[in-house]
Amino acid sequence: MNMGMSDALFPHRLSRRSLLRSALAGGTGLAATYLLACSDGDGGSTPGATDQPGDGEQVRFRWAQLAPAAPLPPARRDHSLVTDGASVYLFGGQANEPRGDLWVYSIADNAWTNATIEGGPGARFGHNAVWDTNRSRMIVFGGQASNAFFNDVWEYAPAEGRWFQAKVGTEAPSPAPRYGAAGAIDSAGALVVSHGFTDQGRFSDSWRYDPANATWADITPADTEEKPIERCLMRGVWDTVRDRLLMYGGQTTDTPFLDDLWALASTGWQQLPRSPNPDARNLYAMVYDDRRKRAILIGGRTPAGQMNDVWLFDATDEFWTPTTVRTSRPTPRYGHDAAWVSETSTILVFGGNDGLEDLNDIWQLTPPASDLEPIAPTPTP
């Protein structure tokens, strides 16, 4: 594939995939070598991979463990983590028992504050939480505590230091209580949740909550052949490229690990490209990079055990890319959560379980400035 002079001078006009293919074919007139951030997908370093195009080109993802001073949140898993850009809000989860505490992490100060107050949601885990930018509040939905499942909605207002329970009408339609649903905030500032389960079984329905008037709407698409089966224990992110919910993997009856990627838009469900893709898994963390328009999946539990790999899903070209990290990294884990900090283009990851114990460490993942960067100048003949 040959590029014109305009494309050669301005490679950002090309998709990352087409530029990589052209570079590998030797058909570019670029004065620099561009490499796509990817690897063999095992989450670890691959010796010599930088010399093998297509099997682990050079990567610039960096992990760094943060070391805030005490006090620190107790170890936990199945919690929520959201951010307003300056602070990160950690709520709930479970260790030996469900937790109902609220902790606030200052990004600038690298410090935790226990913000637990009376009058908030009861202890729970496996709930959904999002940050409502329009109203500067954290919205919490559902979850589980022991044998109890919830479908209540709560909002935390940091400016007031208070919790508010949404007054959803008892006669109005609303989702059944559930745990482990996919959830994200859409472009209009509404909470979208899909699937999940209770002790009565798993769900395949989808709902949209409008915080402005505290109302739910059932947005489950009409029955079609193309739709995800009932499932739970997965995450959701909102793709701003096509205005849709992205949901990967999870667990269903008799199949503890799924590896399919689905998108829910106003037109219904669509299954997205599958190969290459992350191993089948549940209880992973996933965020959305709103600058580069991609979902970033981190770790989780697979048939082989806990993982600490990182995968990217390009929302524009719709393909997965495995990444590798050349620095120390978190132990493999599941039940952790992550928050995308747009202001610094970084990801913060907290807690989870490594298969032996619950954790309370916090890590920062820094993506490369660009997936395609000049590595070294190439002499022009």
What does each of the following model-derived ranges do?
Residues 42-381:
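Kelch-like beta-propeller repeat domains
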Residues 1-18, 22-33, 38:
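N-terminal secretory signal peptides
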